[in-house]
Regions:
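Short alpha-helical segment of the dimerization/phosphotransfer core of two-component systems
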Residues: 57-62
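A conserved beta-strand-to-alpha-helix junction within the catalytic ATP-binding
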Residues: 83-101, 152-153
């Protein structure tokens, strides 16, 4: 590793550490604040369930964030071996869609899955990280009563996964940045949806682990399509 590469790596490490500290502080501050109010009997008895629910919600957000940070750190370690097995990507995508169906229903988003039974030699853990974050992102950032199309196919002998939504779209100037760690186009919307800012970064890491690449096609107020080539 030359000096320039070492400096870049060190800068990225420091930025990541600073972002992690900031992201962890937000839910921890909320949990501490709500708990302190309850401890000092400053919450009316009838409001206790509401405050307890807020603490639980922030705790879940914190746990999700910590898990995503661990995943990113593991994917950064090029020496970690994840194992391989033949996976039917279409069936795997259906499993993930089924798990995310309650979220889709809560947001009135219709998810449609189509494509071919494509076999791929890969880690189930990494394929779960790939599909889950792609599909979850398409649901979270969709419009109410929106649609999400998930397609699995094979192009030139390689798996191709497309996730297309009817969301608000991503401005051109941000399209190259949405896979960066903790980058959010709309921070207020991300807070409402509970996003950690690491989902698409995890997708990028998984795709790069398998030597693939990602395309993004987006139009404002029409939607976004993310295409993964493995």
């Amino acid at each position: 590793m030359d000096i320039t590469e070492r400096e870049r790596t060190e800068r990225m490490r420091k930025e990541f550490s600073a972002n992690v500290s900031h992201e962890l502080k937000t839910p921890l501050t909320s949990i501490s604040g709500f708990a302190e109010l309850m401890e000092n009997h400053l919450v009316a008895p009838e409001d206790v369930p509401e405050f307890a629910a807020k603490i639980h919600r922030e705790s879940e957000r914190l746990l999700t964030l910590v898990n995503d940070i661990i995943k990113v750190s593991q994917l950064d370690d090029k020496e970690v071996y994840y194992g391989k097995e033949n996976i039917d990507l279409l069936s795997f995508a259906k499993e993930v869609c089924d798990r995310l169906e309650p979220m889709a229903q809560s947001r009135n988003v219709t998810v449609e899955l189509s494509g071919d039974a494509v076999l791929y030699l890969a880690s189930r853990q990494l394929m779960n990280d790939l599909f889950y974050n792609l599909i979850e992102n398409g649901i979270k950032y969709n419009k109410p009563n929106g649609k999400l199309w998930v397609t699995v196919s094979e192009k030139k002998g390689h798996p191709c996964i497309s996730v297309k939504d009817t969301g608000i779209g991503v401005p051109m100037k941000y399209q190259s940045r949405i896979f960066e760690r903790f980058f959010r186009v709309d921070k207020s919307h991300s807070k409402q949806t509970g996003g950690t800012g690491l989902g698409l970064s995890i997708v990028k890491h998984v795709v790069e682990y398998y030597g693939g690449y990602i395309e993004i096609h987006s139009k404002m107020e029409e939607g976004t399509e993310i295409v993964v080539h493995l």
